[in-house]
């Protein structure tokens, strides 16, 4: 098996992992009833857009579809940081509300351990990075 074949199989595997992640994440969020506020729909939207980009790159890996995948996966990863910020700021606000004597510094650790899981949105960062890795030195994107 040539190196090109191995690289192509690895790209397909990574696309599969990204697709599974982008399907399972919204499913878990539905189970957690993560649908009460408008901002809670962000992971659903970016997961859907990510799935469309993955499907395009899987079905027809062209320069255009791979660039779309790259940029979409960057947006997926960035949205994850928005989620981490929202989770942390919600926990921090709640901690300061129930402990008015706390300074912001005192509230940092309890906010990190709060009811909104700080790192849970990070799964989309992982999906985004893996999706971008698929495009790394892809033959369709390499100049001849």
What are these regions (language model features)?
Residues 36-46, 69, 100-103, 108-110:
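Non-cytosolic membrane-interface motifs at loop->transmembrane helix junctions
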Residues 78-97:
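C-terminal TM-helix exit segments that contain a strictly Trp-centered aromatic cap at the helix terminus
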Residues 10-11, 29-50:
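Transmembrane alpha-helix entry/boundary detector in multi-pass membrane proteins
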Residues 1-19:
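Cytosolic juxtamembrane helix and N-cap/initiation of the first transmembrane helix
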Residues 11-16, 64-78:
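Interfacial segments of alpha-helical transmembrane regions
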Residues 32-41, 91, 112-119:
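Membrane-helix interface and helix-disruption motif detector
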Residues 99-140:
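Alpha-helical membrane-associated segments of multi-pass integral membrane proteins
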Residues 48-69:
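Canonical alpha-helical transmembrane segments
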């Amino acid at each position: 098996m040539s190196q090109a074949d191995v690289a192509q199989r690895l790209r397909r595997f990574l696309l599969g992992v990204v697709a599974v992640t982008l399907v399972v994440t919204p499913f878990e969020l539905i189970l957690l009833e993560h649908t009460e506020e408008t901002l809670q729909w962000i992971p659903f939207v970016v997961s859907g857009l990510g799935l469309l980009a993955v499907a395009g790159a899987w079905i027809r890996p062209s320069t255009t579809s791979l660039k779309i995948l790259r940029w979409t996966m960057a947006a997926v990863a960035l949205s994850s940081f928005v989620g981490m910020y929202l989770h942390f700021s919600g926990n921090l606000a709640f901690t300061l509300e129930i402990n008015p004597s706390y300074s912001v510094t005192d509230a940092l650790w309890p906010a990190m351990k709060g009811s909104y899981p700080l790192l849970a949105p990070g799964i989309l960062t992982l999906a985004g990075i893996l999706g971008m890795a698929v495009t790394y030195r892809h033959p369709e994107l390499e100049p001849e």
